[in-house]
Amino acid sequence: MVSPSLLGLFYHFYKIFANDIGYNRYGGIFMYIDEIYAARDYIQSRYKNPIDVAIVLGSGLGPLADVINEPVEIDYKDIPYFPVSTVPGHAGKLIVGEIGGKTVACMKGRFHFYEGYDMQKVTMPIRVFSALGIKNLIVTNACGGVRDDLNPGQIVIISDHLSFMMPSPLRGPNLDDFGPRFKDMTDVYTSALRSLAFESAKKVNVDVKEGVYCFFKGPQFETPAEIRAFKTLGADMVGMSTVPEAIVARHSDMNILGISLVTNKAAGLSNNELNHIEVMEAANSAEERLVKLVKQILEDM
């Protein structure tokens, strides 16, 4: 006959390992790491050379990938466990090749929290890039301008971010293979790369400014009241991406350069109704300047 104490012990372990919480805490994290390495191995099977820089392209900014020399195109759907882009303007391809003398892995389309993915899936590509040994990340986005001098068409180098309205992508058991439990976020956007970006911009005569990017979960655009509140807190731009990726890249000790393209004034700062078509059109109109800038940055890195 089984003693009550043994039954109690069995029930304790059942609760830990069999229910959803126990699965996510003790089992899911190991599966996630396996998925990262499976995705890495597949990409390495398609492109065997070392990669210098990973680039994440935001809404309407996909044409930058079109200037890659000798491109190897990999559909996201073919990469094991990779999410799939669902947003217009995000093609859903990883393109590996050469720009400006550097070997790059360029994400033509990214993933957002508002698409229904959890933060681990949203940031999985960054984990895969780290597992590939990539040390440098350029992350771009289309954003709303909050600061008075940030009008549509302006390119902005991200100096810092506000992120407290989102669940941290580092939440849950720590991925010790990638970084420590508690990571310093003082210099998320690497100061040396920010300085380099300004020097590169001068060389190609592209006007750039610097600002603080504020993350909103979306998919709805921000309200005028939210914009007023976050402007008071120091936000210069607002958007629905970039920050989760930057946090995970920083956790993995990658060098990070964030580039925002202002595609509209934020809510309440103009008479125009906000819509995604406007974002795409503004991004497309700035394509030539952004491509020129990023190519020069890559040459100078």
Label every model-predicted segment:
Residues L9-F30:
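Short, Lys/Arg-enriched N-terminal segments with co-localized hydrophobic residues
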Residues A267-M301:
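His/Asp/Glu-rich mid-to-C-terminal helical/loop segments that flank catalytic regions of hydrolases
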